[in-house]
Regions:
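Extracellular protease catalytic domains of secreted zymogens
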Residues: 1-155
Length: 155
């Protein structure tokens, strides 16, 4: 029996180490926008790193797909700092590229590149849940990852 581990690549774009929070409550950028990072354990060569996309439809017909990036939004109703809502990805500073990745991307790739695959992560087309007694839309690679794990389990 084959076992796959699908891991979210994160929802903070290339700013995983900063938790995606990029501004203070007055809107001034406080993050180091030159410090790119990827998420662990998604950078492990032993997992499938799940990125995010945004699906477009025309009625019930698929009309396209783009990289998931919903831009800056407030952290929560009680935290007015802005954070980035976008698929995680990039090049690991620590993990060596696995042989299956260098075979696909070429020998010049020396560090682990992620994500490996991507699935719908946009909040607008994500999942509807009940939260505090009311409907709530969720998205992110933390939703995409278990959805794809379920699909892989059926394959």
């Amino acid at each position: 029996m084959r076992k796959n581990f699908s891991i979210s690549s994160g929802d903070e774009g290339v700013y995983e180490s900063q938790g995606g929070v990029l501004t203070n409550s007055s809107g001034t950028v406080t993050a180091d926008l030159t410090a790119y990072s990827v998420s662990e354990p998604a950078a492990s060569p032993y997992v499938v790193a799940m990125g995010g996309t945004t699906l477009s439809t025309n009625g019930t017909t698929w009309a396209g797909e783009t990289v998931w990036n919903e831009g800056l939004a407030t952290v929560s109703s009680t935290d007015t700092r802005k954070r980035l809502w976008a698929t995680g990805g990039g090049v690991s500073s620590f993990e060596t590229a696995p042989s299956w990745q260098t075979a696909a991307l070429g020998s010049s790739v020396t560090k682990r590149v992620l994500p490996d695959v991507a699935f719908d992560a946009a909040q607008s087309s994500g999942a509807q849940i009940v939260y505090q007694g009311g409907p709530y839309a969720i998205g992110g690679t933390s939703l995409a990852s278990p959805l794809v794990a379920g699909i892989m389990a059926l394959a």
